[in-house]
Amino acid sequence: MASSADVYVFGDQSTPVLDKLQALVRVKDNALLTSFLGEAFLAVRREIVSLSSLERKSIPEAESLSLLLEGVRRSEPHAALDSAFVCIYEIGYYIDYLARSDKQHPPAAPSLLLGICTGSIAAAAVSCAKDVFEISRLGVEAATVAFRLGMHVRRRAENLGYSTPSSWSMILSSNQEELVSEALKEFSKEKNLTYSSRPYISATGPGFTTISGPPSILESVKSCDTFSGKRLYPAPIYGPYHNSSSYSESSLEHGLASILEDVGFLENEMLIPIISCASGSRLDQLSFGNLLKNVLSSALSQQIRMDLVTDALVETVSGTEATLIPVNAQTTVCSLADWLAKRGATTRIGPTLESLTKDRAEPNLAPGDENKIAIIGFSGRFPEADNLDEFWDLLIRGLDVHKPVPEERFARDHYDPTGQRKNTSQVQYGCWLKSAGYFDTQFFHMSPKEAMQTDPAQRLALLTAYEALEMAGVVPDRTPSTQRNRVGVYYGTTSNDWGEVNSSQDVDTYYIPGANRAFIPGRVNYFFKFTGPSIAVDTACSSSLAAINLAITSLKNRDCDTAIAGGTNVMTNPDNFAGLDRGHFLSRTGNCKAFDDGADGYCRADGIGTLILKRLPDAIADSDPIFGVILGAHTNHSAESVSITRPLADAQEYLFKKLLNETGIHPHDVSYVEMHGTGTQAGDAVEMRSVLNSFAFDHSRPRDKSLYLGSVKANVGHAESASGVLAIIKVLLMMQKNTIPPHCGIKTKINQGFPKDLDHRGVRIALKDSVDWSRPEGGKRRVLVNNFSAAGGNTSLLLEDGPAVHPARQHQDGDARTEHVVAVSARSTKALEENLKALEAYIANSWAPEGELLSQLSYTTTARRVHHSRRVAFVTNGLDDLRKSLLKAATDAGQVKGIPAVSPKVGFLFTGQGAQETAMAIGYYKSFSSFRSDIHQLDSIATLQGLPSVLPLIHGTTPVEDLSAVVVQLGTCIIQISLARFWISLGITPQYVIGHSLGEYAALQIAGVLSVNDAIFLCGHRAALLDKKCTAYTHGMVAVKAAADDLRQHISSDLKVEIACVNGAEDTVLSGPNADIESLCGKLTQAGYKLHKLEIPFAFHSSQVDPILDDLEELASQVGFHEPKLPIVSPLLRTLLTGDTLGPQYIRRHCRETVDFLGAIKMAESQGIMDRSGMCIEIGAHPILTRMVKSIIGQDFRCLASLRRKEDHFKTLADSLCALHLAGFSVNWDEYHRDFASSRNVLQLPKYSWQLANYWMQYKYSWCLTKGDAPVENGPVGAVVQARALRLSDSVHNVIEQVHGDKRSSITVESDMHDPSLLAIAQNHRVNGLTMAPSTLFADIAFTLAKHLIQNHGLDTHTNLPSINNMAVEKALIVGETGPQLFRASLDMDWTTMRGSVRIFSVGANGKQTTLHAVCDVAVENPSSHRESWQSNAYLIQRGIKQLVQGASDGSAHMMRRGLLYKIFSNSVQYGSAFQGIEQVWFDSEGLEGTGKVFMPSGKDTFALNPYCCDSLGHITGFIMNCSDSLDLDDHVYINHGWRTLRLVEPYQCDVQYQTYVKMQAVGSDDSTYSGDVHVLRDGKIIGICGGVTFKKVARKVLEMLLPKPSGAKAKHGVVKHVAPEPVKHVVLTPPSTTSHSVGTTSPPEPTESPVGSASGLIQKALEIIADEIGVDISQLTDTTLLADLGVDSLMSLTILGNFREELDLDIPAAQFYEFSTVQDLKSFLGANDQDFSSSNSEAESSASSAASTSPSDHGDDVVEEVKPVVAEIPRSTSTILQGTKHCSQTLFLFPDGAGSATSYVTLPSISSDMRVIGLNSPYLTKPHEFNCALQDITGSYLNEVRRRQPQGPYHLAGWSAGGVSAFDAARQLVSEGEVVESLILIDSPNPVGLGKLPKRMYDFLEKSGIFGAFEMGEEAQAPPDWLFQHFCVFIEALDRYVPEPFEHGMAPKTTIIWAADGVCKNPDDPRPEAQPDDPRGMNWLLNNREDFGPNGWDEFIGAGNISTMAIENANHFTMMREPIASALCAKIRETMGVN
């Protein structure tokens, strides 16, 4: 029997593989295949990312091979992807073929491989693979090579001018090679084709010939006589393959070298011979590298000769039975079999993969690096440690940081040592974060209001995630593994403390997203825009390690490429302490006593930890820092335990051994175990047993391989859901520090239940001192981290050291760059300053070599940092210089402005002649591989055209003056094209180009007009024509500093001198014969002109070039001119070039005519292409054009250089990149650093300098202790529950809250201005007709609060008396006509300083501040010290009083009595009799000095500091200032602005005679401000001083504007009904903690209001609205503040705009508001519109205007509802004014669609200037989880809000989508109640009957299509909050249940239905979800084009006669709501409502 041989035939890209490769991807039972396909995709993706940004645009983005295949299917063919897909498919096919057949690899029987074209690459990988596993590894390398080959061919096609993919080959079904060859030669000659355009024969064989060439040429070939009538089939080959004329030997060698660069396994030897498809020869005994060179050379430059292949196979298989096995080559194999059979060979065709039916055998993959996970960054917050350094410090010092529960968490009354009281615990200790509430709201774009409601765990997860990413140097989208859609977030979290006890006390908008645990990872995803998995894990104590385990699994399964993983635990809920204590988990004596014999439970702890994880190969490829490597992680459960909470040794032991076995690690190679170690008797014993059984089961462990045990819980407690990640971070720090810290858990003696032979087993515990733990030489340390859960779960993780030397830097040279860019950025000025100082300090403390440190600093701060809006950057060559620059920049940080929202325009300027030099661009050539590759590629094109190589110009081997014009000019062009490409590769893409003279060739190429091939052809052959037809140096050019018009007057007719270039207003170049030039130069010199002769051989743009023009035009006719891809500014035509103006004639004129650079730049400036804010980069040897451009546009126009003479190119490049970065461009820093491997080390620089403030919502009143108690006995349901109030005085009516501690105390009180005692004060004090509280009332309140706290603190009130200092009245407290009118006061007292601060403010119905009235300070002082010092000066005061009294007698002073005095006073202040305490006054009008007698009769009041008396004692100052004839008082008054100090040695009393004295003195040089000290005397002794009483001059008109008219007083406050006083809670604080109540420290006082009728008043009001809405002090709204940084998102913007319309009558379109990026932008707009505002606000606005976005408390409704029994009430709907103001004549109400928010309508343009448009919000908008009622049930809530806005009809209602159904139901209810609905508008609202619920696949489709779920905000689409989508889902549920009721006959309103004409999938080829049988009607209605524009079922409910319909063309359901179609919609609405 004849022997057999297998011939595997690998096909080329002519056979489609997309579907077949997709089928392979779906194979799930071949692990090796799956692994190969995944790795091959990653390899291809790395190649894609390495391309320039321009090249990447042609490749669809995808996160998997499957998605990439789908993307390619919908896009144009791509040669690189085609080539790679063929290779991947064929290798995958071969792998799967082996698994499904009986074949082996290497094959047992004789075998051959045959690869056709690109199929040879796959064949090469198979040939050189030693086993099936190596096929996968070599296959990945082959895929890389195939992609590069295809990219090489694509670039050649583009260089030839063919960028649009079309077929480059067609097959003639006959073998007539000679005939075809002759025909093609004749064709090329006839068409005058250049070599690169000529068609050629690329393949021949029995029965076929393949003709290849440019697509447009092939089309012409078809019409040749030779091929007329013959069948030519196009082949899917998209580039010039198999073309020998395209390559010289050197260019081919260079091309192969670039393709094979860094390819692995090149030394592998062939195991299976290959038949060459080019020669038919047998290839064997070659290395993989040489084999690839052979097959690549064949694919690029050699014909396919299937005739020779057939000959070779006949010879090879002779005498054997050959089996031809097709691998993507079924057609080829059939043809081969036929050809062989005709030659007598015996062959058969083997089975295909599809025909095999054997079961698949799944190979086991050997463990390797691809299964390892690198930890590349980590961060955390730890008990008593805010950063990693502090954490390590407490570890190494062996500290135990447990402490009592801080007061800010919960009160001490939750502790009960007896354990008898309900809900208490006997535990009083924990381990606590120092700064749990601190957060940087501006950085994370979160408003303080939202931050306050957001769980600190969420906020700290954000902070630590950013820090860990920064540590890792992760820049999103930098590499394939950091694409945003490939980053997953996994956090373990088990408690919900914040939502349970803190934010639940005041449930508001952000309660759900702020408190729900799922938002912890979700918040990280959302902020960073990571769209990978977002998963919260709860496995109790092991949550964080379980989350990390899940992240590792996701990485291995390629669900993501980068994982952010960790855990959080912030304890605020006392119930958890109580529950764990009563469950016997917790220690009552302190911290976790791990390994101690007296272990009695665990100590609870806070903790946050975050890790950044990647697959190890990805981390190495990305040059990431690697701090540790995870070998494996697993989780199981102790299900067999006796109790669910009791750990099981067997389960843990199984887990440990499973890890060791799977990772191949010997137990003795593990040197440290980080134990769970909670310090419980059961847990410690079980864990020790399982660890010893696994790692030290006997005494065989070598002495030099000790096993150390430890537990971080002994230091920082048990952080529960964060405990695992904290343990890992401890281990990572140990690896960094090479030290095992001491274990502090053993307080008495080691657990006696542990085995006694630990020492013999080699087990150690570092007890007192730290232990050296250095990495073994050439080895790795390995660690087990163990974590188990109270719920029975066990998770363990095995990790080891990372690579000792990063593989990317193993074979590195030093960084050759002499100058480096170092960048620093921040999001705020203060952060920028601190970042700069921190970096300087880091450098100062570094010991690294200067060159290495500088290089790596540059890499880290540019390529590995996210760059923020405030930027500074430096170009430096030394550390000293850099440190000085950093400190200088820190000082000047306040001057740094944010980068513009849109980067400025940038253009490329291409220099002309005259700048060339020897060794031009040599620095770039040597330093940057991409530039060097482009030079070689372009040079090879030139040499193939018969032109000389330009490399001598670059290498500098020949001086430039000795080089030919061809080399110089062509070299300039090639260098410029390469430089431009280099800039583009750095991320700088030009928006326009300008070429000066010679430079225009490169400009035309970069703009896409000329292919690279044609640009080289024209430029090179033009220069050759010059050499041939012109004589060098017979003509010259001279630059003259003069205007062209002036020079024309000097050029006589006998001189053949012409103007060659007009470079500027006084910058002109002349050209002509040398003699004429010399003659003219003499004249010009005599005339005083400055000139400079240019050293060039030829004078372009002169008569010298006339001989070449015809030939040049003929050459130009041979090339193709394409439409420009970007604007080209033409100096020839002084206009923008278009396809019509470009052609051979243009090239001719360009050579000969004048270069009007001046005219071109002016034109570009006039058309907005160039402007002063823009930038340009000069592409040339020296920035010659820069000077010209600046002289035309202005010196501030920024021009950057690529090269400068006599300047290191590194400095030039660095300077330019630095400038671009600072201008806001996203520089591709990775590309900049790519060629400098030694720099690619991520330094561990100081972390970002957060600007933190404390956002803490205090848990109050210990209400957890009373949960479940019977309610306090109430009266009838709904009655007010009157709790006993604590009234301190007649000014302090009710104590709301007081907290007393050793170091701090605080109190908050509430009073009613309509209480008789306070109302009397205000009614006796009227200013400008307004009833107003005096400032002395505020002083009394402050005095009262201070005395109360002094008494409660146990101090003697006789020796500790408060002084009231720095009183500042911010806004008058005006009393309304009706009450109650509540205001509050708070005092925070610091007993360490005996100082406190007071705030007095009005409150709304919800108890929240509405207006701040006054602030002051309190100081507790001993009055005796004042009495002594005052008495020493009393004689001076008494002498002054005496002189004034005597002066009244001698005429030098005046005396006045009470009646006249207060009558004069009444001009400004009307005092009632109760305030008229002055009996007599003596005063010196000119000296502003006075004294008075004051007597106040006694009353029944209980004031601490009687305001009547206090005010009267101060009247002397007001009288002196406003009754003086020495001051200008005709048009001005002097207003009291507070005082500096008010000190008493005894309280004021009634029925006592006082004497007052004051002398007022000017402050400053003018009369605007006066100040004085009021002395109060009793019986001649000073008993009080009011110091620094200040009056300021105010115009009477301004005063009238500042103070509202009395008629408006009615609206000055909200009417608040009485509520039950809250019980007073006394909280005892344990030192040294303090109580934190609010944001940061005391808020600064609010600024005084500006007049509202002015621009500044408008701005002030607007800023107050914004500040109030986002919850910040108005002082934070600085001009440079970014609104987005404050959390002003789309939803908040809607509310703010509504408030503007309601309170300010200011209508700003939403789209315009979104354009305001900073506060200054808004202020500029408001300043420009102040006139409109002023005219519409003639009356002063109320200080308590109702908010535009309303809530229940805004309505003044009785808040007693809070104590009603809980019933299923519908929450109130809210609304926002979207358009118009209250003055509009009509109002249109828009009902929300399914999302529930009015934001759906914000994109509508103005409907009418006379229409107010109000958008309603769903009552369940932010709490969709509560939406469980019917749709018609919420209609009443909507109507309540409609009636609040418009109490009576007629009404106009409308709604889009599902909102139309709500509008219909509302209209029906209104009509049934007798109201008039004038119009109902249904905007593309389907009839709800039978609509059906949309399936999730529909949502996914809409979201993926970018249709659903994005809200346009400015130019950026922002995703809405998660609850918006949740609301949509629950609303659709309600809509599905809704059964509409028809209107009663004759009652339906006029109804208009406006339909969109199109479906979402308008065109047949539009993507659409796959149809399913259960697709609901609503789904088809959305997707398909509409055909019926009638009522569509609505007539059943409204009546056909009441309905009119309209349709909007070219609009679908979604696009109709956005511009430009929204304008058409608004026009339809106007038409319907009959408005203009």
Swiss-Prot record:
Its EC number is 2.3.1.-. InterPro entries: AB_hydrolase_fold, Ac_transferase_dom_sf, ACP-like_sf, Acyl_transferase_dom, Acyl_Trfase/lysoPLipase, Ketoacyl_synth_AS, Ketoacyl_synth_C, Ketoacyl_synth_N. Residues 8-242 are annotated as: N-terminal acylcarrier protein transacylase domain (SAT). It is an enzyme of class 2 (transferase). The active site is at 541 (for beta-ketoacyl synthase activity), 676 (for beta-ketoacyl synthase activity), 718 (for beta-ketoacyl synthase activity), 997 (for acyl/malonyl transferase activity), 1325 (proton acceptor), 1511 (proton donor), 1857 (for thioesterase activity). Pathway: Secondary metabolite biosynthesis. Residues 1295-1599 are annotated as: Product template (PT) domain. Residues 1638-1654, 1734-1753 have a biased composition (Low complexity). Keywords: Acyltransferase, Phosphopantetheine, Phosphoprotein, Transferase. This is Bikaverin polyketide synthase bik1.
